[in-house]
């Protein structure tokens, strides 16, 4: 595809956002309903161009339940819009070869764009670099705005309500970045005063690393002398460096601590002179989910159950009083809060024996890294349904400061026409170990009725072993925690299995 928008350098930053229809069935794709983007001058932070359009999905069944949203997007409006194939050239022209920016775009919008181009058989646009303001601001701004969603950040800075329309949201995104950068710029100017007043601690100055060094302002400096480039004017580069270094937005987007840099390999370090001269901001690929995962590991969690010992931290059916279940907001990370579920004053963890597997593991469903989702569906007994319904009620009704438009997903799954056959999804965790995928949940097999637990080692090389052990009709003892989540316009309670005992019949 030809790219005609803007100059040959394509130096503008493309802030973009998608509005989508949330899948109603497992494995169903997201349907893009709206695309919006602005091109921003990286030196003056001035909006140079804007574009937005509603998008009609090729599969209209994906919007069969779409009603008028608070944002104003309606089914009739979507039905009268162009399909993605009809706007693909325009989207490509806006995005290809530019720096991409947006909120949670690495995990969501970038993936949806690539899927949309793949669906129509075209090569997707490729970014020069990517700036994900969710992960970036979570690192640099310290989560002072709670969950760091766009709505929470806008409320924090008094920018009004999030419109949930693509063009409005990308403009708000730019304003949020400006505000955050200004606060960080002011704090860096008088750190002894302003950082003491803040609940965010300033980051340590980076130290020397291989393939170059990191200087005080956090920008990678090439170990190669600037004189080796015949096109570089050292004097002008010095002046440009001073100007750009002091720009709060550029400082925010290029600063990188030693701990950040060590989290991923940089195969081709960018020469600092080229970086400043052309204002090509380095790619930021740190995953906000990894940061949250680290915090969760440091936070209180149920001890790993022994293979045969009684697991006292996990409550059984006769040990739970529905009236004692409550949800509460507890301190999480750098001043933010998260929801936690309790039974009286103890974190709520459950064990349930002889649950029958309704649907086993399916390789059709994978996570963002391409790993199979090791989830199973089990029949939910009446007593378990009562407890999970009470958990849903406590969590769903907990007042929070940050507004959300997430759809609440009940923990107990009740299909139309099968109300008397409720089920629940158990999440078996998977962990990456290089090229291998390991099962993070402790899995055992046990011969009934008096057998001992035998550890089942599971990796991507022998995933069939776990699949064949969890066929429909199999009975399992499950020990699980209840973890509230709110992600990609969906919220609910995840049943995260810590230990799973597969019961074998003699």
UniProtKB/Swiss-Prot annotation:
List of residues binding Mg(2+) 2: 17
Pfam families xref list: RNase_T
InterPro entries, per the entry: Exonuclease_RNaseT/DNA_pol3, RNaseH-like_sf, RNaseH_sf
EC number per UniProt: 3.1.11.-
Residue ranges, annotated region (Disordered): 204-240, 289-313
Superkingdom per UniProt: Eukaryota
Protein name: Protein NEN3
Organism placement in taxonomy: Eukaryota, Viridiplantae, Streptophyta, Embryophyta, Tracheophyta
Gene induction: Regulated by the transcription factors NAC045 and NAC086.
GO molecular function, one term: exonuclease activity
Species annotation: Arabidopsis thaliana (Mouse-ear cress)
Active site: 164 (proton donor/acceptor)
């Amino acid at each position: 595809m030809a790219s005609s928008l803007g100059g040959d350098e394509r130096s503008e930053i493309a802030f973009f956002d998608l509005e989508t229809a949330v899948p109603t069935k497992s494995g169903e794709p997201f349907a893009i309903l709206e695309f919006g983007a602005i091109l921003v001058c990286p030196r003056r932070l001035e909006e140079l161009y804007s574009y937005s359009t509603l998008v009609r999905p090729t599969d209209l069944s994906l919007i069969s339940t779409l009603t008028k949203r608070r944002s104003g997007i309606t089914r009739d409006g979507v039905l009268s819009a162009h399909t993605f194939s009809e706007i693909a050239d325009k989207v490509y022209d806006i995005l290809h070869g530019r720096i991409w920016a947006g909120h949670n775009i690495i995990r969501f919008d970038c993936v949806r764009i690539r899927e949309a181009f793949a669906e129509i058989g075209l090569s997707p646009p490729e970014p020069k670099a990517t700036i994900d303001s969710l992960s970036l601001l979570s690192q640099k701004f310290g989560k002072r705005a709670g969950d760091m969603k766009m709505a929470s950040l806008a409320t924090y800075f008094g920018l009004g309500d999030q419109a949930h329309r693509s063009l409005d949201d990308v403009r708000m995104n730019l304003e949020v970045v400006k505000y955050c950068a200004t606060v960080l710029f002011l704090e860096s100017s008088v750190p002894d005063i302003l950082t003491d007043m803040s609940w965010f601690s300033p980051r340590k100055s980076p130290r020397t690393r291989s393939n170059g060094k990191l200087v005080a302002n956090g920008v990678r400096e090439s170990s190669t002398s600037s004189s080796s480039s015949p096109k570089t004017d050292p004097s002008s580069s010095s002046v440009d460096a001073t100007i750009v270094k002091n720009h709060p937005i550029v400082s925010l987007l290029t600063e990188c601590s030693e701990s950040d840099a060590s989290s991923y390999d940089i195969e081709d370090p960018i020469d600092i002179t080229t970086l400043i001269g052309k204002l090509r901001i380095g790619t930021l690929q740190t995953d906000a989910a990894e940061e949250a995962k680290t915090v969760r590991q440091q936070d209180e969690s149920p001890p790993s159950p022994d293979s045969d010992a009684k697991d006292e931290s996990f409550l059984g059916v006769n040990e739970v009083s529905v009236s004692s279940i409550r949800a509460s907001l507890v301190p999480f990370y750098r001043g933010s809060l998260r929801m936690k579920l309790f039974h009286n004053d103890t974190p709520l963890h459950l064990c349930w024996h002889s649950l029958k597997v309704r649907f086993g593991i399916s390789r059709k469903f994978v996570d963002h890294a391409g790993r199979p989702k090791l989830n199973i569906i089990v029949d939910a007994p009446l007593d378990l349904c009562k407890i999970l319904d009470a958990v849903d009620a406590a969590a769903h009704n907990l007042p929070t400061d940050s507004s959300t438009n997430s759809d609440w997903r009940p923990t107990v799954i009740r299909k139309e026409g099968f109300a008397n056959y409720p089920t629940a999804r158990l999440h078996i965790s998977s962990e990456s170990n290089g090229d291998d995928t390991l099962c993070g949940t402790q899995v055992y097999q046990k011969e009934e009725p008096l057998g001992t637990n035998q550890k089942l080692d599971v990796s991507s090389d022998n995933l069939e072993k776990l699949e064949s052990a969890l066929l429909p009709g199999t009975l399992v003892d499950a020990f699980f925690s209840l973890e509230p989540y709110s992600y990609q316009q969906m919220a609910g309670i995840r049943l995260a299995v810590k230990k799973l005992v597969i019961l074998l019949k003699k």
